[in-house]
Amino acid sequence: MTDVFSQAQHQLDALGLRCPEPVMMVRKTVRKMADGETLLIIADDPATTRDIPSFCEFMDHTLIASDTSKTPYQYLLKKGR
């Protein structure tokens, strides 16, 4: 079985950062990516469990997968739909 998170083209380490920094860093990173590229976000701020999915929906990106069952949390985002 392939780990979906290992397929990311880009990675963002947001460990130790607190709201709103993780989402601000995600936005800055995604701006530099091409449509269809993927980003693995690793974070430990509990607010990201709400903020990352909301960011994806608001900005029209796709949240391919997330694992918030334990820290660090992992999110796999695809730029665009």
Swiss-Prot record:
Matches recorded under CDD domains: SirA
Taxonomic superkingdom: Bacteria
GO molecular function, one term: sulfur carrier activity
Family membership noted in the UniProt record: Belongs to the sulfur carrier protein TusA family.
Protein name as annotated: Sulfur carrier protein TusA
Function: Sulfur carrier protein which probably makes part of a sulfur-relay system.
Source organism (scientific name): Shewanella denitrificans (strain OS217 / ATCC BAA-1090 / DSM 15013)
PROSITE patterns in UniProt: UPF0033
One GO cellular component term noted in the UniProt record for this chain: cytoplasm
Active-site residues, Swiss-Prot/TrEMBL: C19 (cysteine persulfide intermediate)
Gene Ontology BP terms: tRNA wobble position uridine thiolation
InterPro entries according to UniProt: Sulphur_carrier_TusA, TusA-like, TusA-like_sf
Keywords (A to Z) from UniProt: Cytoplasm
Localization, UniProt: Cytoplasm
Record carries keyword Transferase: no
Protein's gene: tusA
Keyword Cytoplasm on entry: yes
